[in-house]
Amino acid sequence: MSRFKLFSITLVILLTLNSCQSRQTIWNPVESTINEIQDALILGEITCRNLVSIYLQRIETYDKPNGINAITVINSQALEKADKLDRLLESGDSLPELFCIPIIVKDNFDTHDMVTTGGSVVLRDSYPPDDAFMVGKLRDAGAIIIAKSNMAEWAFSPRETVSSSFGRTANAYDINFVPAGSSGGTASAV
């Protein structure tokens, strides 16, 4: 084999290997820790908007279509908040502790931007003027409240998650079972 052919074959192999290594894998936040998510954000592997969109898409794909019914309401301002946090990241300013971490809160926590029913149809039009103390702390720390989860009416049942406002929540791993109790929506949402 001539030197030219050997050189050409070697060059093609090296270029092929290099192109395989340079392909960027799609980052997947499922089962990621807060630190892993924030590292991916800081390294530019994902934007805050992309992250929130992934979680909203997962809710749309898995919750109602699969009969889980863990989510009661989606925060219509979640992507807008994500855009603001993307701008904060670009600015180089210091980032809050829970920067861009998507959070789902139980429907008995007041949120100024979503209905709070406590699982009861009686409160179907209850839009609190302020956040609950802990929700405010989460937002101040940079978390994005993306949705609220179903709960047993008035947080009363230790056995199953059924509310007059949003119905029954099933176990995310097997819808023939219940996630149990007043926080079942949160359990299945996770």
Regions found by a protein language model. Name each.
Residues 65, 98-190:
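Short glycine/serine-rich loop/turn segments
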Residues 17-19:
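C-terminal motif of bacterial Sec signal peptides marking the signal peptidase cleavage site
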Residues 21-124, 155-156:
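Short, well-ordered alpha-helical
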Residues 10-14:
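Gram-negative bacterial Sec-dependent N-terminal signal peptides
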Residues 7-9, 110:
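Short amphipathic alpha-helical "recognition" segments used for binding
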Residues 1-7:
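Bacterial N-terminal signal peptides that target proteins for export
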